C-alpha cells in the first residue's frame, strides 16, 4: 500500500482555530468519579455519594502497547506487543468521619488482613468497577471511562503537623486496573 503524501499546511487564522474548538475545550476541573466498593468492604450509600464530591483529583486513564524488537540483519523491526494499563490514582478530601478512607482501609484489609495475613483469594470478590465522567460546562457527560476490576494497592499517609493551618487533609489511593473502556464522543465503544 502506498503511503499518502500530505500537502504543506495552509496559512491558518484564529477564526479557523475557533471554528474547530466548537465546544470551547474540555475542562480538567469538570469531572466526577463514581467508586463502588465490593461486598467484602461494605460501604453504605452515604460513602458512595460522598466520594462523588470528595474525590478532588483523578486522571483519565493511560494505556500502553509495548513494542517487541525483532532483530533482522543489523536492523530492528518494531512489532506491536501486549497492551497494559497503568495504575490509576485518585486524591480524596478527608472528612471528619473518615468514611471514604475507612472504606478503602477495610477493602485493603479484606484483601490481606493485618492480624493474620489471611484474605479474600477470589479476585471477583475483591475487585470492583469505577467510573470517571468528563463533564461539559452545562454539567452534561461528554465521555465516560469505566475502569474494570480495580482494587487498591496503596492508601497514602496523611501528613499531620502543628504548622498546617487553613488546610483540609487529603490522601491518595492507587488502584490497579485490569482494563478500561471509554464511552461517548470521539471513537465510541459500545456502552455497557
What positions do the PLM features span?
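Glycine-rich, low-complexity intrinsically disordered segments
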Residues: 1-192
Amino acid at each position: 500500500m502506498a503511503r499518502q503524501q500530505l500537502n504543506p499546511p495552509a496559512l491558518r487564522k484564529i477564526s479557523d482555530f475557533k471554528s474547530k474548538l466548537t465546544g470551547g475545550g474540555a475542562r480538567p476541573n469538570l469531572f466526577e468519579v463514581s467508586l463502588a466498593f465490593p461486598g467484602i468492604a461494605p460501604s453504605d450509600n452515604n460513602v458512595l455519594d460522598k466520594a462523588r464530591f470528595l474525590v478532588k483529583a483523578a486522571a483519565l486513564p493511560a494505556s500502553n502497547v509495548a513494542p517487541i524488537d525483532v532483530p533482522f540483519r543489523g536492523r530492528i523491526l518494531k512489532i506491536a506487543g501486549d497492551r497494559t494499563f497503568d495504575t490509576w490514582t485518585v486524591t480524596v478530601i478527608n472528612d471528619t468521619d473518615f468514611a471514604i478512607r475507612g472504606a478503602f482501609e477495610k477493602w485493603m484489609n479484606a484483601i490481606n488482613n493485618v492480624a493474620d495475613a489471611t484474605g479474600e483469594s477470589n479476585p471477583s470478590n475483591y475487585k470492583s468497577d469505577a467510573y470517571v465522567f468528563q463533564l461539559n460546562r452545562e454539567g452534561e457527560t461528554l465521555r465516560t471511562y469505566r475502569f474494570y476490576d480495580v482494587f487498591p494497592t496503596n492508601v497514602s499517609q496523611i501528613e499531620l503537623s502543628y504548622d498546617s493551618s487553613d488546610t483540609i487533609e487529603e490522601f491518595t489511593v492507587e488502584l490497579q486496573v485490569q482494563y478500561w473502556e471509554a464511552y461517548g464522543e470521539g471513537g465510541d465503544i459500545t456502552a455497557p
